[in-house]
Amino acid sequence: MLLGFFRLLFKGLYRVRLTGDTQALYQQKVLITPNHVSFLDGILLALFLPVRPVFAVYTSISQRWFMRALTPIIDFVPLDPTKPMSIKHLVRLIEQGRPVVIFPEGRISVSGSLMKIYDGAAFVAAKSQATIVPLRIDGAELTPFSRLKGLVKRRLFPRIQLHLLPPTHLPMPEAPRARDRRKIAGEMLHQIMMEARMAVRPRETLYESLLAAQDRFGARKPCVEDINFQPDTYRKLLTKTLFVARILEKYSQRGEKIGLMLPNAGISAAVIFGAIARGRIPAMMNYTAGVKGLSSAIAAAEINTIFTSRTFLDKGKLWHLPEQLTQVRWVFLEDLKGDITLADKLWIFGHLLAPRLAQVKQQPEDAAMILFTSGSEGNPKGVVHSHKSLLANVEQIKTIADFTANDRFMSALPLFHSFGLTVGLLTPLFTGAEVFLYPSPLHYRVVPELVYDRNCTVLFGTSTFLANYARFANPYDFYRLRYVVAGAEKLQESTKQLWQDKFGLRILEGYGVTECAPVVSINVPMAAKVGTVGRILPGMDARLLAMPGIEQGGRLQLKGPNIMKGYLRVENPGVLEAPAAENQHGEKEAGWYDTGDIVTFDEQGYVRIQGRAKRFAKIAGEMISLEMVEQVALGASPDKMHATAIKQDASKGEALVLFTTDNELTREALLRYARQHGVPELAVPRDIRWLKQLPVLGSGKPDYVTLKNMVDEAETTHE
């Protein structure tokens, strides 16, 4: 009677909905593992689960008055993690057929993300061989009974959903010591909990996610700031988005791919979301690619119009681009203000009241944006991402990292770079954090000063950029940073050490590719290992394809919700080439993406990058990684830049060519370093060529296409 009354009360107040297959709860041995977001969680499960479970409650909490008051509707047993008998009692309850609920986090989340997972819950599951039923609680974190005060917009009676996920099992890990078995089991349960979060992520478009963020964090919450130092709130960003959405309709058609050549600025975010809302597909133009690279991109994506800014072209000295790329129409944002009419203003005002109506009909699987590969190995390819793939990557990042609305991101990587777009714009916007958009990562004195001035807590960039920021920064500039993330190129040991010595900060290295939106793996404070790029993100499947001549590891292939829709190539303009990869039997499998990177996995699942499959040389029958050659050069000459190419060799098949900005670097110095670090002599180049400056791409990575052309031209001249 009492249980029924409270069930009706909560159903009316919170519109509680239970989803998923409840049959798993009736199996003989069941362990339910929910996330923990509020003080209401236990009551909600007791009221709305179709079985009457036993809750494991910490002894300190079980003795409080409110727990005694709840005994008519909740069965619980005290849990003392320091006493093994508590764990054994839970195992016996499960073996007797009672469903047991354990909150693996052991405490209410204070970040909105998963907290630390305690090994005890995993050990109970493995020891009892129970069926694990993961459960996600969504919405309760918005109530006053959560611990997210100041991080979300609280409301008295938000809608609450309880998601039952497909059941799974956790086998007892094989390890010699009980402590090791518990630790491994805990990591396995953590993976299950992360996969559960990914499984229930909302099916939304990017524009709908922006509206959801405004609803969750509040319309008055600042979200974007740029060098004008006038932060935009979610409401102001939405207003600009609707303005752009209305104007873009006069210059483009629904479904059209439109080029955006814009700097890191608040208006750029508005243009992106405005275009998406009205069914246009923004193609982020890499203005550092030059006329040739941009021409290839324009042709591949069949772009007819590029939106840009006169001020941006002035400051970037980029007027040669519209002067030479005459095959497209150039539209300048400064000219659009004069196009606004009274009818447009009324449309914008009306849709501010009902912003969801501004979006034309779209599905999460539809094409949302086009990014372009760097062109480091040939013509740039258009990478088409759906709303689903971009938002999946954001959700993967949110699942493993504890970003909150208290964080402030410094985003200097350009938005045409997938790292800059997803990590530098979408992730902070959808986590409630504020982002400062800065137009150039090359201003090594300015960026650290802005990090200090704007109290930034998150900074990311390439190893090259981070090294230069550290060189010019005051030791106190980075006092607020919680996360320093390196990606897009290998993190150099000297950079890592410099940050540790000067600022006391650990750089977290990650790995990504544009085709994966882009983050694939990343070290985070909860799971980090030196020398690796972290573990594969939840929701993704990974496999290694054996490569002839490579003994350790293999070619990394990936499948998951963050994989692109496909390529657009200049050789076949406008035609989408869906991802597919050859398996070990030589058969093409749809949905898999071949990264072309050679990697290894250790026993804990951490990834080590060996190098690009295309960046191996076969010398005297041995496979030599060009990445390893560059590491030798960097070790012998740490303050200079180095890059390796390949040339043909009559006696050994292929030979190495080292380009360096160190005019004093000799083969003897390279040999000395190689011998000290166990690197084979075959990996030490005989052909060393000095360049005053290495050709680089906009991301800061060496331009290997140009370097290879230089080698080929020299060989032709020599012949």
Curated annotation (Swiss-Prot):
How does the record say this protein sits in the membrane? Multi-pass membrane protein
Report the record's Gene Ontology biological process terms.
fatty acid metabolic process; phospholipid biosynthetic process
The main location class comes to membrane
Pfam name, any one: Acyltransferase
Q: Which SMART domains match?
A: PlsC
Q: Which CDD domains match?
A: LPLAT_AGPAT-like
The secretion signal range is none
Give me the segments passing through the membrane.
Answer: 258-277, 409-433
- Keywords assigned by UniProt, alphabetized: Acyltransferase, ATP-binding, Cell inner membrane, Cell membrane, Ligase, Membrane, Multifunctional enzyme, Nucleotide-binding, Transferase, Transmembrane, Transmembrane helix
Q: Which GO terms describe its molecular function?
A: acyl-[acyl-carrier-protein]-phospholipid O-acyltransferase activity; ATP binding; long-chain fatty acid [acyl-carrier-protein] ligase activity; medium-chain fatty acid-CoA ligase activity
As its record notes, the protein acts as a catalyst of: a 2-acyl-sn-glycero-3-phosphoethanolamine + a fatty acyl-[ACP] = a 1,2-diacyl-sn-glycero-3-phosphoethanolamine + holo-[ACP]; a long-chain fatty acid + holo-[ACP] + ATP = a long-chain fatty acyl-[ACP] + AMP + diphosphate
| Region annotated Acyltransferase, chain positions | 15-138
Q: What is its EC number?
A: 2.3.1.40, 6.2.1.20
The answer to whether the entry has keyword Nucleotide-binding is yes
Annotated InterPro entries? Aas (IPR023775), AMP-bd_C_sf (IPR045851), AMP-binding_CS (IPR020845), AMP-dep_synth/lig_dom (IPR000873), ANL_N_sf (IPR042099), Plipid/glycerol_acylTrfase (IPR002123)
Q: Where is this protein localized, as stated in its record?
A: Cell inner membrane
Which family is this protein grouped under?
In the N-terminal section; belongs to the 2-acyl-GPE acetyltransferase family. In the C-terminal section; belongs to the ATP-dependent AMP-binding enzyme family.
Give the protein's biological function. Plays a role in lysophospholipid acylation. Transfers fatty acids to the 1-position via an enzyme-bound acyl-ACP intermediate in the presence of ATP and magnesium. Its physiological function is to regenerate phosphatidylethanolamine from 2-acyl-glycero-3-phosphoethanolamine (2-acyl-GPE) formed by transacylation reactions or degradation by phospholipase A1.
Database matches in HAMAP family: Aas
What protein am I looking at?
A: Bifunctional protein Aas
What is the scientific name of the source organism?
Klebsiella pneumoniae (strain 342)
Record lineage: Bacteria, Pseudomonadati, Pseudomonadota, Gammaproteobacteria, Enterobacterales
Record gene name? aas
